[in-house]
A protein has these predicted regions:
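General beta-strand structural signal in soluble alpha/beta enzymes
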Residues: 78, 135-136, 163
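Metal-associated gating/positioning segment near the N- to mid-region
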Residues: 83-155, 171-176
Length: 189
């Protein structure tokens, strides 16, 4: 997996995909988001000068032409001139608490709580890269569930998480994090 930070920097050069984040905050208020372009995923076309209205419930209530539509002074305006909006991206296979650069026996050097901290950093990196929803498909110590709770409670920023908790796998197989043979438990040599 490419570093989320590097991926985020590349994506932010040409697009802004925080629309879903703003639309989904708990303290949603009436607001309008304007930009130079918006990708319409249903038609596959670029829409020029969109004005996206977000209601009290955090949902998009209307999309209009920013050059002709007007809104009241009670509506918060988020001006993203020069940017292109796209819907939040979804990644259906992530391991937020498993940094790609730490594998094998090297993982045994770290405490259990370390992996939860990496999940926080990787969740933020995924969000910065434009991913607003992820499915975490296995996490030691249920770090994905803890991160989801912290995000939902507003303690940290990150994408919506569909957690799995512990991964399922065969002893000695893909999900066996000890990397040790089952015979070791029996004292065999």
């Amino acid at each position: 997996m490419e570093s989320g930070v590097n991926l985020g920097r590349r994506l932010r050069l040409s697009t802004i995909s925080l629309l879903a984040l703003w639309a989904g905050t708990a303290s949603a208020q009436n607001r309008v988001i304007t930009a130079d372009r918006m990708i319409d995923v249903q038609t596959g076309k670029s829409v020029e000068y969109p004005a996206i209205f977000v209601g009290e419930d955090g949902r998009i209530s209307n999309i209009a032409d920013a050059r002709t539509v007007r809104w009241g002074s009670d509506v918060k305006h988020i001006n993203l001139s020069g940017k292109t909006l796209l819907p939040g991206l979804v990644d259906m296979h992530v391991h937020l608490d498993s940094p790609a650069n730490i594998g094998g026996y090297r993982g045994l050097e770290f405490t259990d709580s370390f992996w939860g901290m990496t999940a926080v950093a990787n969740g933020q990196a995924m969000l910065d890269a434009g991913f607003t929803t992820v499915r975490n498909v296995g996490s030691g110590n249920r770090n994905d569930i803890g991160l989801k709770q912290a995000i939902d409670a507003g303690y940290v920023q990150g994408p919506r998480i569909v957690p799995a908790g512990y991964a399922l796998g065969a002893t000695g197989g893909h999900c066996d994090s000890t990397f040790l043979p089952p015979s070791l438990d029996k004292g065999e040599k």
